[in-house]
């Protein structure tokens, strides 16, 4: 009997402990969700300004009047950047909304959430279209540098700002466009709107915008319920990521798309852009295994990084880092230099090394491995970097295309 009582007490104790831990985890998860997922709050703020005539855009009517835009699954990783899967009529998209004043770069420090910060205050009433053009030109010149074809970009931006396609940009449309232009991702989407690997902009209202949905939202890996993720060791998780990948020819096609995107942003029409968070979750692909960008918020103009980092004091190189992957060096005067140490191509090759070498056909494995390691070794500050960059990138693409061009999987 004593033995039976002991077993019962032990059983009750562990049952109570399991219930307690489970309840605590659910409570923490719920609190985290309510803090991270504030889509209704974002919609209310945007629609309030739309109804007051402050802002306008192609998505405003569907969001605030007809209610044909629905917020689905919350994907937000930070409270100030709201991201949701959404539906707009018969289109599937991704809804992105800013919950703070994110008008400048930060170096790892979260900004305070906005409370009464006045957004949509520019341009002011009475601003002419010509004056607005000058404002836009000045802004993109500051962000991108003095490129010779900035006027073409200004025209693209004004075309995007004319949401109802009536040939005129109203003041509410201009206020929305100006707020969106403060965001790196929106500016890059306008610049790369005709490129294959950039998601299409479906519409916007204020600084809320909707992009094309990418079916597969990570370069590799498997999405697991959070309750399972908690109990999986990091080493096993990384191995699992490599298990759940497409066939090798399809992986090669995805990587070719990633290399093409690197080409798109490397010293293009409007300057050079830097990839400051090169992680698998920022790259996806569609049903045809064409690469599509998932998140471009940490892809920034090189000129912007130089402008901000040159004033930063430092003790070591680790103080001169923006995002996860854009770093410069700390000089003897304890100031950050303005030249990045690693080009985009080297970061991308490091990301796809294990992904691409796993399952590689034996006849090209040695050559592919050699090229990938040469790519990883690229430095940004070398004398002939641009020539080496082009040579390595083209050789990699040619090797992969040659191997997969006659396969059905590609």
Curated annotation (Swiss-Prot):
Chain ranges on the Lumenal side, renumbered to this chain: 27-410
UniProt KW keywords: Disulfide bond, Endoplasmic reticulum, Membrane, Signal-anchor, Transmembrane, Transmembrane helix
Gene Ontology CC: one annotated term: endoplasmic reticulum membrane
Record's bilayer topology term: Single-pass type II membrane protein
Location within or outside the cell: Endoplasmic reticulum membrane
Keyword Transferase attached: no
Residue intervals passing through the bilayer: 6-26
Disulfide bonds: none
Chief location: endoplasmic reticulum
Cytoplasmic side: 1-5
Post-translational modifications: Among the many cysteines in the lumenal domain, most are probably involved in disulfide bonds.
Keyword Transmembrane: yes
Record family assignment: Belongs to the DIPK family.
Protein name, per record: Divergent protein kinase domain 1A
């Amino acid at each position: 009997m004593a033995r039976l009582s002991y077993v019962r007490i032990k059983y009750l104790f562990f049952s109570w402990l399991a219930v307690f831990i489970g309840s605590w985890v659910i409570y923490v998860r719920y609190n985290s969700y309510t803090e991270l997922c504030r889509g209704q709050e974002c919609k209310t703020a945007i629609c309030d300004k739309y109804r007051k005539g402050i802002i306008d855009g192609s998505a405003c009517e569907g969001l605030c009047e007809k209610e044909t835009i629905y917020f689905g699954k919350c994907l937000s990783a930070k409270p100030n950047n709201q991201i949701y899967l959404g539906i707009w009529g018969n289109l599937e998209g991704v809804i992105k909304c800013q919950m703070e004043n994110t008008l400048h770069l930060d170096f790892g420090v979260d900004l305070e959430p906005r409370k009464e910060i006045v957004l949509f205050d520019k341009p002011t009433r009475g601003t002419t279209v010509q004056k607005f053009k000058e404002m836009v030109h000045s802004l993109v010149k500051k962000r991108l540098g003095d490129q010779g074809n900035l006027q073409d970009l200004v025209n693209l931006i004004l075309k995007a700002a004319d949401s109802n396609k009536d040939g005129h940009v109203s003041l509410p449309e201009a206020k929305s466009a100006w707020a969106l232009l403060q965001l790196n991702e929106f500016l890059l989407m306008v610049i790369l709107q005709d490129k294959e690997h950039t998601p299409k902009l479906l519409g916007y209202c204020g600084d809320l915008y909707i992009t094309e949905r990418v079916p597969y939202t990570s370069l590799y890996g498997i999405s697991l319920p959070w309750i399972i993720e908690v109990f999986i060791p990091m080493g096993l998780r990384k191995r699992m990521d490599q298990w759940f990948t497409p066939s090798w020819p399809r992986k090669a096609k995805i990587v070719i798309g990633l290399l093409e995107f690197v080409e798109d942003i490397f010293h293009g029409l409007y300057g050079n852009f830097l990839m400051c968070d090169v992680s698998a979750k920022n790259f996806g692909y569609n049903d045809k295994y064409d690469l599509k960008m998932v998140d471009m918020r940490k892809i920034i103009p090189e000129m912007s990084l130089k402008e901000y980092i040159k004033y930063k004091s430092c003790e070591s190189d680790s103080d001169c880092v923006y995002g996860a992957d854009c770093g410069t060096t700390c000089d003897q005067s304890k100031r950050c230099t303005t030249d990045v140490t690693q080009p985009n191509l080297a970061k991308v090759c490091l990301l796809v090394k294990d992904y691409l070498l796993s399952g590689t056909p034996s006849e090209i494995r040695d050559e592919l491995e050699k090229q990938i390691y040469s790519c990883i070794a690229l430095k940004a500050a070398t004398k002939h970097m641009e020539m080496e960059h082009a040579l390595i990138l083209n050789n990699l693409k040619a090797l992969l295309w040659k191997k997969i061009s006659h396969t059905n999987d590609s």
